[in-house]
Amino acid sequence: IESYHMYDSMVEVKRYFTKFGGHKLAAGLSMDRENLEPLRKALNEKAKLTEEDFIPKVHIDVPMPMEYANYNLAKELERLEPYGVGNPKPLFAQKDISFVEAKRIGANGNYAKFTVEMMPGGYPRKTDLMYFGDVDAFCTFLDEKYGAGSADHLFAGDKSYLLSITYQIGINSFRGRESLQYIMRNYC
């Protein structure tokens, strides 16, 4: 939770710890077991979180049509690595992209590979868009947005749907070949 400062909160209840340390986003501690419930109660009482604090926030670096994100840009972005909390991987956004087909991938079918259609220069071009999130939740969202059975139609490839997304780009290396890879992070 972005608005919750872990270390500052721990300082307020330090009497429950034998030792502790950390920063805004992470903390470590040692404590006696009998202090667990009093600690939980004290932290909950002192927390100044609102319902809005629990809503995940998405920070978009640049709204950018997918056709502008190319292999050369992905190679340039590699130079900014390593990515982490202080240096997040750039996140792009595009409104109203056409999802034309989908298939489950991965050993358990828990990921998805979508075929999306872009319109660079007014000419349609299809490309792959990977999704490593909760595919079942995506299907539920699609059915709620466009009606029951919509996800089945998309996976059958017989109906397309417009969605707005955030995405990242990277280089996929497979069998000695490199290619641009689009990865969806969020959708609405």
Predicted regions and their residues:
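Acidic, two-metal ion nucleic-acid-processing modules in DNA metabolism proteins
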Residues: 1-188
